[in-house]
Curated annotation (Swiss-Prot):
It comes from Methylobacterium nodulans (strain LMG 21967 / CNCM I-2342 / ORS 2060). GO terms for biological process: translation. Belongs to the universal ribosomal protein uS2 family. PROSITE patterns: RIBOSOMAL_S2_1 (PS00962), RIBOSOMAL_S2_2 (PS00963). One of its GO terms (cellular component) is cytosolic small ribosomal subunit. This is Small ribosomal subunit protein uS2. Pfam families: Ribosomal_S2. Keywords: Ribonucleoprotein, Ribosomal protein. Transmembrane segments: none annotated.
């Protein structure tokens, strides 16, 4: 694999060159402004293209070395695509309110994540021994914790790089990253301060089409990093007979990007349960929401490899979900897309 390709025309069509009204500008962005049209600042895409490429390279390099990338975008038009892009590239995200101390007080955040796991396990087991009211309260607690921490519950520690949409809105996240020395790649609009951003990508941070394009490129760069990292380790996770086409958002011409629950039919080995792994089992904890206990449950059911999950058809998902009492987790947490990304990366290595 290689870094994803993009063109200045794509950026233009997505509206990446439109800044804010001239009177709302931040003077520190002056060098990135091409001019003014109808009192709107126009961003110099001749600078955006190499800056975005540099950010993509940083993401790929970080993931190739085993690092973690955290997507941060809590504004309405960014929330869904940030989550979808992080999931399909096996990375992490915050798309709800940023909790103070998410990075600088990771120990406390870890405690909340452990509580989420415990509540999840109780409810996954049917909440036996609990009253209807207690189950309802636990369900509400789970929803609240999932909204705040669902995108980072499997991160295992602070990330190695942040990718941020809208530096004004995500100032707290950027300050925490700066305090810990974590590099930040960010989309910086004409009303924002580029200081403290490691990889400044001057571009519109409000248009839905533009945000979808940025997140898609970053996700594909992360997948490239996975491929490079596995190639360096000489890993072979069980490649399909012919390479898979890389998954893209449903339609970059739309302001919203649809969540990909079940992707297109898989062009690899058919789904089957195994009596034993074929060679070394894959590290299924890399899938969102999968811990050691759930890995054991999957192994006991005959699931050891990414290719098995990648090959699941809707009826397979329904059957496994029902038998293991996963409560819709396979679709909700995007396991199939993540598994296909790992299989694709292994095939390209």
């Amino acid at each position: 694999m290689a870094l994803p390709d993009f063109s200045m025309r794509q950026l233009l069509e997505a509206g990446a060159h439109f800044g804010h009204q001239a009177h709302r500008w931040n003077p520190k962005m002056q060098s990135y402004i091409f001019g003014t049209r109808n009192n709107i600042h126009i961003i110099d895409l001749a600078q955006t293209v190499p800056a975005l490429y540099q950010a993509l390279q940083a993401v790929s390099d970080t993931v190739a070395k085993g690092g973690r990338v955290l997507f941060v975008g809590t504004k309405r038009q960014a929330a869904d695509v940030v989550a979808e892009s992080a999931r399909r590239s096996a990375q992490y995200f915050v798309n709800s309110r940023w909790l103070g101390g998410t990075l600088t007080n990771w120990k406390t955040i870890s405690g909340s994540i452990q509580r989420l796991r415990k509540v999840d396990e109780i409810l996954a087991g049917g909440g036996q021994g609990l009253t209807k009211k207690e189950r309802l309260m636990l369900s509400r607690e789970k929803d609240k914790l999932e909204k705040a921490l669902g995108g980072i519950k499997d991160m295992g520690g602070v990330p190695d790089l942040l990718f941020v949409i809208d530096t004004n809105k995500e100032q707290l996240a950027i300050k925490e990253a700066k305090r810990l020395g974590i590099p930040v790649a960010a989309i910086v609009d004409t009303n924002s301060d580029p200081d403290g951003i490691t990889y400044v990508v001057p571009a519109n941070d409000d248009a839905g089409r533009a945000i979808a394009l940025y997140c898609d490129l970053i996700a594909r760069a992360a997948i490239d990093g996975i491929s490079r990292g596995q190639g360096a380790l000489g890993m072979d996770l069980g490649a399909s007979e012919e390479p898979l086409a890389e998954e893209l958002p449903a339609n970059l011409n739309e302001p919203e990007v649809a969540h990909l629950d079940i992707a297109e039919p898989y062009v690899g080995e058919p789904f089957e349960l195994l009596a034993a792994p074929r060679g070394a089992p894959d590290d299924l904890t890399k899938l969102t929401g999968v811990g050691p206990q759930l890995v054991q449950k999957l192994n006991d059911a005959g699931i050891y490899h990414y290719w098995q999950i990648a090959a699941m058809a809707p009826e397979d998902v329904a059957k496994v979900d029902s038998e293991l009492k996963l409560n819709g987790r396979i679709e909700r947490d995007g396991w199939i897309n993540q598994a296909r990304a790992f299989v694709e990366a292994a095939a390209a290595a």
